[in-house]
């Protein structure tokens, strides 16, 4: 029976990471981790020296990525603060992969 699988609930949140997160390959590592976890969305450097972005994934994957953003072990990076929007359920993905915006 085709299509008999249960659809996964998808959730989304926005993030902004503060600290020493530019010039230390933070976006590259974030993209790699998101792809490893099956998280879709994007990240980019801001003019204020932060990295911000959006995440979309099933809840467990989203929470793993959120934890990674707060506690990563990227050489030379130092997160001083991580801000996240409220998690919202969405009907379907709006991104097809995880991208680094320039």
Swiss-Prot record:
<dbReference type="InterPro" id="IPR001792">
    <property type="entry name" value="Acylphosphatase-like_dom"/>
</dbReference>
<dbReference type="InterPro" id="IPR020456">
    <property type="entry name" value="Acylphosphatase"/>
</dbReference>
<feature type="active site">
    <location>
        <position position="45"/>
    </location>
</feature>
<dbReference type="GO" id="GO:0005737">
    <property type="term" value="C:cytoplasm"/>
</dbReference>
<feature type="active site">
    <location>
        <position position="27"/>
    </location>
</feature>
<dbReference type="InterPro" id="IPR017968">
    <property type="entry name" value="Acylphosphatase_CS"/>
</dbReference>
<dbReference type="GO" id="GO:0003998">
    <property type="term" value="F:acylphosphatase activity"/>
</dbReference>
<feature type="domain" description="Acylphosphatase-like">
    <location>
        <begin position="12"/>
        <end position="102"/>
    </location>
</feature>
<dbReference type="InterPro" id="IPR036046">
    <property type="entry name" value="Acylphosphatase-like_dom_sf"/>
</dbReference>
<dbReference type="GO" id="GO:0016787">
    <property type="term" value="F:hydrolase activity"/>
</dbReference>
<keyword id="KW-0378">Hydrolase</keyword>
<protein>
    <recommendedName>
        <fullName>Acylphosphatase-2</fullName>
        <ecNumber>3.6.1.7</ecNumber>
    </recommendedName>
</protein>
<comment type="similarity">
    <text>Belongs to the acylphosphatase family.</text>
</comment>
<dbReference type="Pfam" id="PF00708">
    <property type="entry name" value="Acylphosphatase"/>
</dbReference>
